[in-house]
């Protein structure tokens, strides 16, 4: 079986490609992660987002601990063929391990001299409740 579509992706020196995850409908950017060839292949095969966890050094099926899986509607490759975009339905409405809708919940406000990052999105569910009883969870 040919997998030439995998060869079109420009993988980095570690065999990874950056992935932007966008919510179908709202177009919110939910998160950023990485995939290796196997993760991208499994994502296509299952219709659910699978990433490569750099900290765990293994495949990471998004939602495997929290239940907040990402159902993939569309996969796109950018013009340089080195970034992947997933358009997903976020099950449970929570993409971030902090219990928020999206990982980009800190907003810069102010000037270059006195600016700071401020939390602008609420926690929808306490991470301790999301991951309670999950052995070895690290809220990724």
Swiss-Prot record:
Keyword Hydrolase: yes
Main location: cytoplasm
Gene3D superfamilies in UniProt: Phosphoribosyl-AMP cyclohydrolase (3.10.20.810)
Pathway: Amino-acid biosynthesis; L-histidine biosynthesis; L-histidine from 5-phospho-alpha-D-ribose 1-diphosphate: step 3/9
Positions of Mg(2+) binding: 78, 80, 82
UniProt keyword Hydrolase, yes or no: yes
Record field: catalytic activity: 1-(5-phospho-beta-D-ribosyl)-5'-AMP + H2O = 1-(5-phospho-beta-D-ribosyl)-5-[(5-phospho-beta-D-ribosylamino)methylideneamino]imidazole-4-carboxamide
Free-text comment on the cofactor: Binds 1 Mg(2+) ion per subunit.
Keyword entries, A-Z: Amino-acid biosynthesis, Cytoplasm, Histidine biosynthesis, Hydrolase, Magnesium, Metal-binding, Zinc
Single GO BP term: L-histidine biosynthetic process
Residues noted as binding Zn(2+) in the record, renumbered to the chain: 79, 96, 103
Cofactor field: Mg(2+); Zn(2+)
Annotated GO MF terms: magnesium ion binding; phosphoribosyl-AMP cyclohydrolase activity; zinc ion binding
Compartment list: Cytoplasm
GO cellular component: cytoplasm
EC number: 3.5.4.19
Annotated signal peptide: none
Function summary: Catalyzes the hydrolysis of the adenine ring of phosphoribosyl-AMP.
PANTHER family: HISTIDINE BIOSYNTHESIS BIFUNCTIONAL PROTEIN, HISTIDINE BIOSYNTHESIS BIFUNCTIONAL PROTEIN HIS7
Subunit structure: Homodimer.
Assigned protein family: Belongs to the PRA-CH family.
Listed name of the protein: Phosphoribosyl-AMP cyclohydrolase
């Amino acid at each position: 079986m040919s997998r030439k579509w995998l060869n079109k992706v420009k993988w980095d020196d570690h065999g990874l490609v950056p992935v932007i995850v966008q919510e179908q409908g709202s177009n919110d950017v939910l998160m950023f992660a990485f995939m290796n060839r196997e993760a991208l292949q499994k994502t296509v095969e299952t219709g659910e987002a699978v990433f490569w966890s750099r900290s765990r050094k293994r495949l990471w099926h998004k939602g495997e601990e929290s239940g907040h899986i990402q159902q993939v509607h569309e996969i796109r490759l950018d013009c340089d063929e080195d970034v992947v975009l997933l358009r997903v339905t976020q099950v449970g409405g929570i993409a971030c391990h902090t219990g928020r809708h999206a990982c980009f919940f800190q907003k810069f406000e102010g000037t270059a001299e006195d600016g700071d990052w401020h939390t602008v999105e609420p926690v929808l569910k306490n991470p301790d409740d999301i991951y309670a009883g999950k052995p070895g969870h690290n809220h990724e």
